[in-house]
Curated annotation (Swiss-Prot):
The gene is Slc28a3. Homotrimer. Residues 48-63 have a biased composition (Polar residues). Sodium-dependent, pyrimidine- and purine-selective. Involved in the homeostasis of endogenous nucleosides. Exhibits the transport characteristics of the nucleoside transport system cib or N3 subtype (N3/cib) (with marked transport of both thymidine and inosine). Employs a 2:1 sodium/nucleoside ratio. Also able to transport gemcitabine, 3'-azido-3'-deoxythymidine (AZT), ribavirin and 3-deazauridine. One of its GO terms (molecular function) is pyrimidine- and adenosine-specific:sodium symporter activity. Residues 1-96 are annotated as: Disordered. This is Solute carrier family 28 member 3. It comes from Rattus norvegicus (Rat). It is found in: Cell membrane. Expressed in kidney; in the proximal tubule, glomerulus and cortical collecting duct. GO terms for biological process: nucleoside transmembrane transport; purine nucleoside transmembrane transport; pyrimidine nucleoside transport; pyrimidine-containing compound transmembrane transport; retina homeostasis; uridine transmembrane transport. It catalyses: thymidine(out) + 2 Na(+)(out) = thymidine(in) + 2 Na(+)(in); cytidine(out) + 2 Na(+)(out) = cytidine(in) + 2 Na(+)(in); uridine(out) + 2 Na(+)(out) = uridine(in) + 2 Na(+)(in); adenosine(out) + 2 Na(+)(out) = adenosine(in) + 2 Na(+)(in). Belongs to the concentrative nucleoside transporter (CNT) (TC 2.A.41) family. GO terms for cellular component: brush border membrane; plasma membrane. The keyword Heme does not apply.
Amino acid sequence: MSRSDPDPGKNSEPSKSKMSLELRPTAPSDQGRLNEAFQDEDLEEQNAPGNSTVRSRVVQSGEQGRAKQDDRQITIEQEPLGPKEGTEEESEDERQKGFLERKYDTVCEFCRKHRVILQHTIWAVLLTGFLALVIAACALNFHRALPLFVITLVTIFFVVWDRLMAKYEQRIDDVLSPGKRLLERHWFWLKWVVWCSLILAVILWLALDTARLGQQQLISFGGLVMYIVLLFLFSKHPTRVYWRPVFWGIGLQFLLGLLILRTRPGFVAFDWMGKQVQTFLGYTDAGAQFVFGEKYTDHFFAFKILPIVVFFSTVMSMLYYLGLMQWIIRKVGWLMLVTMGSSPIESVVAAGNIFVGQTESPLLVQPYLPHVTKSELHTIMTAGFATIAGSVLGAYISFGVSSTHLLTASVMSAPAALAVAKLFWPETEKPKITLKNAMKMENGDSRNLLEAATQGASSSIPLVANIAANLIAFLALLSFVNSALSWFGSMFDYPQLSFELICSYIFMPFSFMMGVDWQDRFMVAKLIGYKTFFNEFVAYEHLSKFINLRKAAGPKFVNGVQQYMSIRSETIATYALCGFANFGSLGIVIGGLTSIAPSRKRDIASGAMRALIAGTIACFMTACIAGMLSDTPVAINCHHVLESSKVLSNTTEVASCCQGLFNSTVARGPNDVLPGGNFSLYTLKSCCNLLKPPTLNCGWIPNIP
């Protein structure tokens, strides 16, 4: 054994003690504290490059001198490495604190100990103050405060519901489990009774409603049945169709439409909501006017429409930060889940598409996209094609399209998308994602509300640029295609050949089966062609022209060309166009989903075209439901009313038809009068004799022998 080695009999235990103390830093001791005048110097030496050799020098000294290292020596060497903590030091720091600092620490400690009680107290005070304001507003003018009162009640209901379900959900389930088991035992017979009763009720309602309003409702019902049959015939797996989501989806469509379009409370509520949305979006003008000047409306689309997209995107981002949008999406998704039996992923995405776009809604379930089934992936794409984003909803409203019908179409299209998707591509696999996982949604990466607003405005820049660029490109392309078709048609003495004319013949059967008036079927078919081959912006822009011409009460026919549609046809067209189902969106969906889930690229590409067709038919089915429920009177056949009898009677129908005839008549002077709508001068003279219109000089009409 070498001389430098420690004696195993004596120094084995001390050596172990020394090694353990060297590897574990000890707390500083007051006995080993250095002079305070040299504290900074010691710290600088500790941070110097040579301080790593301190431990090795101690070990070497112990080995050469065979001296025991006591705790005090180790503590002195290790003091700069350890934190300076100690009760006496803390008490010394306390004595050095000022009076205000000690009081502040006391208050902070009190708040930490009673944090829950303080939070509840603050919320109670705020809630009490808000309820006092609501009561005061109702006492002053209840009719004026009715919306605030309803919103408050709905909010309180859902907050209390969430708290009760979070705390007593299992108990409620245990109480209801006997009734649930009873229903499950007899459900095979009960479901047939329920479905047959509902079908009979719908048939009876249609019969009575048709007798009151006319036969157009039956055509819409026939169109709905036709689309269901077509989807079943061309289904991916016709024998594997699960009919519960199909019937429930159509049923929810019908119930929502019935509530909104036929009941006064529902219509008033959605009409009020639509007007509030219009008013809210009107605040965009303040920013647009400041940026673009007072004459910003001279460039209506660029400076009036597109800023609405920026504003709405900002608001949506703020609502996401607050968690309100996620809460609404979870509630709507849960409703579709328990009624339709769709998977949690499908329900969440379909509910999300009511508020966000087809590329944003898959982000709600981004972690689970690589694991969804092919049918679920098809449903996700179909839901995107069948609905529109909330950010562009305001732009369509600014065109002059009815905000009530646009909001209704957005809500009705969500269950329609699930029903169509499950019929066109039935589920043949077992979904892997559970309800609990799918309902978890992030609040975004914004750190505060102001940052969320900034991110929302910035994220709208690509969307605005995309809308403007696509409109420029598509309208230019449409003009070129029409010129080329006109040139080609002129070779056969038919220069009227155009893209609109071709689309009107392709989509005319579909538009007619939705229930539009017979004379408007080609006009609606043209709009569907615009929407399918270009985008819905182009289609709604043309629809707004028809609406404005009708409101201006101008001539309905000019040189034999119809200028606008009936109100019923406008309503059905609004529902049929309310979706992103077009070939431009096809590339957007494939690119967006592929970037989110690269492993599913092949499945996305193979199912995208079927999803586009399914989304289009979902919009058509929503239009059929609107046609069944629309109580707008069918357009009067004025040719039959005015020309079937020689003597006109002063009835409402005759007066309406004569007024339309007056508006469409062109009178240049005596004996130079051209009746509109292909009516005869005799009919025009008869209407003049009956009503004597102030806008037309009936003396200019030549005498008819």
